[in-house]
Design a protein with these regions (language model features):
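Short, small-residue-biased leader/transition segments that mark boundaries at the very start
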Residues: 1-2
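Non-catalytic propeptide/linker segments at domain boundaries
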Residues: 58, 77-181
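Extracytoplasmic/periplasmic/luminal assembly and interaction segments
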Residues: 18-74
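Stable alpha-helical elements in mature extracytoplasmic
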Residues: 20, 186-190, 194, 214-215, ...
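Catalytic cysteine-centered active-site loop
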Residues: 197-250
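...with weaker cross-activation on analogous glycine-rich loops/strands in unrelated enzymes
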Residues: 228-287
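Second-shell loop/turn segments in exported
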Residues: 176-181, 202-209, 258
Length: 305
């Protein structure tokens, strides 16, 4: 993390955030025992975060140097942004049959109204890595990207983090584009620009080298540096301006669906030929499109106008 900070503060901040999550989990686990409704419906995201994302955000917001006591308010603020809990109660008027006895000793049934309470509990995990773009200045977002790209020079601190595999122990595959493909001057310029950012971390909403990129921000930036001028588009927006092609060539775009929970196009990369793409995964890297993962999400190839 921030290498100038003490381990006790880094570990303490992570522990404090985990304590907030544990409290929320206990609240949900005991919900039916601590509330008195007739019926419950739960739609709950998993409660989880990555410690490097958390501490990179904290370091960027506090300019690198902080103590645990100084960031407790920040931790609570981030927690409140990440987890959105809603509890809605619907009251239905229902009827039950009650047997009564009249003055002559005869039994008879009547329908008696009563309130029936149905509770709907929803927990949305907004994903902590999506929070920075909504609350940081460009300078802060740049610092966040820097901390994430190096894991704060402390990959030893949280060895179970998924980012250890992504950035340290299981780095993305290398790929060399055949020289003959670079005879196309336009593609050569695209590839030269795109390869400048190999290894940059994925930053949700990022769209420049200073902040790093997300998938569509990366593609938009590269092509706008190479003669296009369509501005910053999302993955769906890029798809919308492309012409679909069943015979992709280097420099075309490749689109995917279902890589995360969103409607329409969810991911985009730059096709470089021979079944490979260069894209802003995490980090920016080459990827083999023939892998089972990418094949299962592949939607279309597109050519920019």
């Amino acid at each position: 993390m921030c290498i100038r900070d003490r381990d006790a503060d880094l570990l303490g901040a992570e522990a404090a955030y985990c304590a907030l999550e544990d409290e929320l989990q206990r609240y949900l686990d005991t919900y039916t025992r601590t509330h008195d409704y007739d019926e419950y419906h739960f739609d709950l995201d998993t409660i989880e975060h990555d410690p490097y994302v958390l501490l990179s955000i904290v370091c960027a917001l506090h300019e690198g140097e902080w103590t645990l006591d100084e960031v407790r308010g920040t931790l609570q603020m981030l927690f409140d942004r990440q987890y959105i809990l809603t509890e809605d109660v619907v009251v239905e008027v229902r009827y039950r049959t009650v047997t009564r006895t009249d003055s002559e000793g005869n039994d008879y049934d009547v329908e008696v109204p009563y309130n029936y309470y149905i509770c709907y509990v929803t927990l949305e995990n907004f994903n902590l890595s999506h929070v920075p773009v909504y609350m940081m200045s460009e300078e802060q977002l740049s610092m966040y990207a820097l901390y994430m790209s190096t894991l704060g020079n402390r990959p030893d601190l949280f060895p179970s983090s998924g980012y250890i595999g992504k950035y340290i122990t299981n780095r993305p595959p290398e790929h060399e584009v055949p020289e003959s493909y670079l005879d196309d001057e336009t593609f050569a310029a695209i590839l030269k620009e795109a390869e400048k950012y190999l290894g940059f971390p994925y930053v949700w909403g990022g769209s420049s080298p200073s902040t790093s990129f997300d998938c569509s921000g990366f593609v938009s930036y590269v092509y706008n540096q190479c003669g296009w001028s369509f501005g910053r588009l999302g993955a769906q927006g890029l798809y919308n301006i492309c012409s679909r092609t069943s015979s992709p060539r280097p420099g075309d775009l490749v689109f995917f669906v279902g890589t995360y929970d969103t409607a329409g196009i969810s991911h985009v990369g730059i096709y470089v030929g021979d079944g490979w793409m260069l894209h802003c995964g995490d980090p920016i890297s080459y990827a083999n499109l023939n892998s089972s993962y990418w094949q299962s999400h592949l939607y279309a190839y597109g050519r920019l106008p």
